[in-house]
């Protein structure tokens, strides 16, 4: 029996919820399905507050951003719980929350290595797509040999 290694990139959008729902509907309960829930976050800059008195003012902003990052990590755990409640076995779900080094699209392409299925959601907004090529488009054009499911 072939194993379905599924990558679920997650970026906290309503469309990403559709991708989660699709993965549950399509693959939950299948013993051969393994899911990696993945989010790569933009790292916070390191600020030396002793270098300048102006840098001290940034401390509260950085504290806020660090707290927001922690909330996002906890929110990803909630999504992991949704997958478990949806029918995936605990040992079949891996949650990855890591610092982004490359572009979001490149991180997804790197992470999908070894996976047989990628579940994406389409980004919303024609205006946004006009100004920046969507992550969805960059990932889809870069991949070969992976089944791509698009929840929209």
Regions inferred by a protein language model and the residue ranges of each:
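Glycine-rich, Arg-bearing micro-motifs that act as flexible, cationic patches
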Residues: 117-143
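A structural signal for isolated positions on well-ordered beta-strands in alpha/beta enzyme cores
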Residues: 5-7, 34-36, 94, 118, ...
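Short, flexible loop segments at boundaries between secondary-structure elements
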Residues: 142-152
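A short acidic, amphipathic alpha-helical/loop segment
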Residues: 21-22, 107-108, 135
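A short acidic, glycine-rich active-site loop
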Residues: 57-74
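Small/aliphatic-rich secondary-structure junction motif
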Residues: 2-61
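Short, hinge-like loop/turn segments at secondary-structure boundaries
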Residues: 53-56, 113, 138
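Structural beta-alpha unit
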Residues: 81-118, 145
């Amino acid at each position: 029996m072939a194993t379905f290694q599924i990558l679920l990139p997650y970026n906290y959008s309503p469309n990403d919820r559709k991708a989660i729902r699709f993965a549950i509907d399509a693959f939950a309960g299948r013993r051969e399905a393994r899911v990696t829930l993945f989010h790569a976050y933009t790292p916070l800059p390191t600020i030396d507050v002793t270098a300048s008195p102006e840098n001290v003012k940034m401390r509260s902003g950085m504290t806020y951003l660090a707290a927001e990052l922690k909330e996002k990590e906890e929110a990803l755990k909630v999504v992991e719980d949704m997958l478990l409640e949806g029918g995936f076995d605990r040992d079949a779900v891996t949650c990855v929350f890591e610092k982004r080094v490359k572009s979001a699209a490149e991180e997804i392409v790197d992470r999908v290595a070894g996976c047989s299925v990628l579940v994406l959601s389409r980004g919303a907004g024609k205006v946004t797509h006009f100004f920046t090529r969507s992550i969805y488009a960059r990932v889809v054009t870069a991949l070969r040999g992976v089944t791509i499911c698009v929840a929209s």
